[in-house]
Design a protein with these regions (language model features):
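Enzymes that bind and transform nitrogen-containing heteroaromatic metabolites
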Residues: 1-117
Length: 117
């Protein structure tokens, strides 16, 4: 922590009851600092936590031409998930951009969608 602060970073501790960052508290703190946009880049657990909390407005998904499979294969989105396609989040205002061999899929999440409910 001291090294980060010495480098000019502001460090906040916002632990929730499970020891993880309390996401609404984080966003409230960012708002108080007049930060109104946040890029979340992380693994499946991080993506799932923000989606489950209904805190995602836009998705940028990078798709590489590689196929993974198997019951234990990693998923790009963790969290609660959905059992059936009808419960999946639907993205709107889609754009697709080719980046070399990869594809960038961008879309907006409807404001009323909340996976945890």
């Amino acid at each position: 922590r001291a090294a980060l602060e010495a480098a000019g970073c502001r460090v906040w501790e916002l632990p929730g009851p499970d020891g993880r960052v309390e996401l609404p508290a984080l966003l409230n703190r960012l708002g108080k600092e007049e930060i109104d946009s946040l890029l979340v880049e992380g693994g499946a657990a991080m993506a799932g936590a923000f989606l489950d909390a209904g805190l995602v407005q836009k998705v940028q998904a990078y798709i590489a031409p590689k196929l993974f499979g198997g019951a234990d294969a990693p998923s790009p989105v963790g969290g609660l998930g959905v059992a059936l396609p009808d419960g999946a989040l639907q993205l709107s205002s889609l754009t697709v951009t080719r980046l070399g061999d990869d594809i960038l899929l961008e879309g907006e999440v409807d404001a009323h969608v909340h996976r945890a409910g």
